[in-house]
Amino acid sequence: LVLKSASATVDGVEHNATIEMHPECETVLFRFDRALAKGQLSLRISFKGRVRDDLRGMYRGRDRKQPWLASQLCPTDARRVFPCFDEPGIKARYNVSVTAPAEDVVLSNAPVQKRSRAVAGSRTTHFEQTPLLSAYLIAVAVGPFESGQTAQVGKTPIRVYSLKGQRPLGKFALEAAAESLIRLEKWFGMPHPYAKLDLVALPDFAFGAMENAGAVFFRDSVLLLDEKESSPEDRLRTAETIAHELAHMWFGNLVTMAWWNDLWLNESFATWMAYEIVHDWKPEWRIWLEFVARRENAFELDALASSHPIAPQVKTADEANENFDAITYTKGASVLRMLERYVGASAFRKGVRTYIRRHRNAAAAAGDLWAALE
């Protein structure tokens, strides 16, 4: 980002700031010519960013016939799109507005509030204010997207979006999302915490999927299936990935880790929960056998000199990125599965529900989960 100017308004008085960049630690310092009075203040920042090509921040797809843009902010790339407190433990409500070509569909975390009239081929889409979210969970996608049928679970509408021409391939994903959401609401004992649930298929994506609140992004090869041509393994992978991302709506989004050293708690829980959900929906798939196979892969990774603790000390953005691996996901899920078997399924579920209720719309650490399980 290029920060052009900044000012703070306190009690109706505006104070201009000097901007001091610290690229080595990816922070910025705003200096004022006098001490600001205690109390609420409004910080206004003028900035300019760029659309990237490396699947980070706000980036463009490679398909020049159907141009599109999307965001990928996890773990530490929100700061490449807009100035923010880019830490998981700091949450805010966001008012997102996007100006784009009038013919394009614009998607974000919240439902559309209004769209302006097209002027010179562009229009602005304004979204409703989000609930409290960490910056890395904000999502925007712009392009020639279309959706098919809508599923409804409780008050939550579910849609699958893909580039034009791929709409029939989202049928299985829509069914899997609805079946997962039904079971997750029952397990957590509370409804889905966001106003909608969009599943968005992107041809170019850094991960298999990303659990942005209310607008989950997927690599299209993971989300979209030709049911006549796909294998049982393909369907299992799609269902498991969807269940994993939807589990994050509660464990990760509604309650977020306070810092990246507890990333394992988010990812291992979603991994474990996805297997529980898919097994309950399709027991004939015997998905726990797949879990055993993945655990062996985690064992092999854990035996290397480069292994790390499940909960390592994270001090930099690079260290946060390095922990998205099988140790965090699968070894952590194995630990949680052992814990669930030790305390009992009912006690474990009760403890997690307590943890979610205590810390909803906030951040928590592993110790908070252990306290809820006592």
Give the role of each language-model region.
Residues 1-199, 221, 226, 324-326, ...:
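Acidic/His-enriched low-complexity segments
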